[in-house]
Regions:
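Composition-driven recognition of glycine/serine/threonine/acidic- and proline-rich low-complexity segments
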Residues: 1-132
């Protein structure tokens, strides 16, 4: 899978080139165009229903994601961010994770797991108790 980020720094667009039978997963509503040989399938975000609902409610992420797969020959699909702005890549290593701002996820390979962290709730609970 190859990708290019075009039109930086504002109005950035992520263009992904897929080999036959290669798949990229993306946030619902992020796709701007795809070639005719790219098939799209929609699924719930997480394997568990509670995980999907948690991401949707607390992470302000869509309940669904889309999987884009090139059929029979190479294909191209492009994505943009929800609030218009720049796009950056985060290269992941095994057992490494990132905490990113809600609504900033656009796309990833299929082996990336998305989860939520309770930072906002923890801060609020701690400030109500006057933690120091």
């Amino acid at each position: 899978m190859n990708y290019e980020i075009k039109y930086k720094p504002s109005y950035s667009m992520l263009v992904v080139s897929l080999e036959p039978n290669e798949t990229v997963t993306a946030e619902a509503g992020a796709m701007t165009y795809m070639e005719p040989n790219v098939e799209v399938k929609t699924r719930k975000r997480e394997k568990s229903l509670l995980g999907t609902i948690g991401l949707s409610l607390f992470g302000r992420q869509s309940f669904f994601v889309n999987d884009y797969t090139a059929q029979n020959k190479a294909g191209e699909v492009a994505f943009v961010s929800a609030p218009v702005g720049d796009i950056e890549t985060l290269e992941l290593k095994p057992n490494q994770g990132y905490i990113i701002q809600s609504s900033s996820y656009i796309a990833s390979t299929q082996n990336v797991e998305l989860d939520i962290k309770w930072q906002g709730f923890t801060k609020k609970a701690c400030s109500d108790k006057a933690c120091s």
